[in-house]
């Protein structure tokens, strides 16, 4: 299955594409816990799917989806209680895994076509919340995520050891109709202790200011 978005093609990957998946998932090898290690990959093939972004015939990014209520969710190392973090049960959520991208395409917004894919898959699977998690040690395109309707919900660890940014968005959000909020707080991205505290108080980061500080609201 292929979908065209501007100059990029998004295509589902299958078992025969395993070398491509392993090429990108090796970026996790430097972390203590790898949620897409070779022994865990079959779980995603069975309960979710891998997708790649192609520039012509060249693969430039890879992501995956996984139903949050699947039995293998815990095997990703995520001990999160989504109901506590998001106010939604796992059965309503579609996990959208880290988006690996080639370094030479740095600065290219792959999130816009990929989020369209995630939304389509959420609709097919009757999920109304997209949950996207990104290793805090890896470069994160906060602005593209915010532009595509995601909010930063928390900084949480995989296997209680590897910190990940946890983003979420409702599938019915209209990103060009964001209401005004009076209770807005600013926090530097580097101040992880303070931003975690704000998230625990119910604040959600939704944008960045000109100095690249996170803007929180609740």
What name fits each language-model region?
Residues 1-39, 45-54, 59-60, 179-186:
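Short amphipathic alpha-helix that is part of the acyltransferase structural core
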Residues 48-67, 76-78, 206, 217:
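Conserved beta-hairpin
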Residues 61-98:
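Conserved acyl-donor/pantetheine-binding loop and adjacent beta-alpha core of acyl/acetyltransferases
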Residues 93-94, 122-136:
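Conserved GNAT acetyl-CoA-binding A-motif
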Residues 98-101, 106-122:
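Conserved acetyl-CoA-binding loop-helix of GNAT-fold acetyltransferases
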Residues 124-126, 136-155:
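Conserved active-site alpha-helix within GNAT-family acetyltransferase domains
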Residues 131-142, 187-189:
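Conserved beta-strand-loop-alpha-helix junction that forms the acyl-donor binding cleft
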Residues 133, 149-166, 204-211:
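Conserved catalytic-core motifs of GNAT/GCN5-like acyltransferases
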């Amino acid at each position: 299955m292929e979908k065209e978005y501007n100059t990029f093609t998004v295509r589902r990957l299958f078992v025969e594409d395993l070398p491509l998946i392993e090429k990108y998932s090796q970026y996790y090898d430097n972390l203590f816990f790898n949620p897409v290690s070779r022994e865990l990959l079959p779980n995603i093939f069975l309960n979710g799917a891998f997708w790649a972004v192609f520039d012509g015939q060249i693969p430039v990014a890879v992501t995956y989806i996984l139903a949050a209520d699947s039995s293998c969710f815990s095997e990703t190392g995520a001990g999160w209680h989504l109901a506590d973090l998001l106010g939604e049960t796992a059965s309503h959520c579609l996990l959208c895994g880290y988006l690996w991208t080639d370094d030479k395409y740095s600065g290219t917004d792959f999130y816009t076509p990929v989020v369209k894919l995630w939304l389509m898959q959420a609709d097919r699977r009757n999920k109304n919340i997209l949950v996207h998690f990104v290793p805090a040690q890896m470069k994160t395109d906060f602005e593209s995520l915010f532009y595509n309707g995601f909010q930063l919900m928390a900084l949480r660890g995989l296997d209680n050891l590897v910190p990940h940014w946890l983003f979420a968005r409702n599938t019915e959000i209209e990103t060009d109709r964001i209401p005004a909020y009076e209770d807005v707080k600013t926090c530097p991205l580097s101040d992880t202790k303070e931003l975690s505290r704000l998230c625990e108080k119910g604040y959600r980061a939704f944008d960045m200011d000109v100095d690249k500080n996170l803007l929180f609201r609740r």
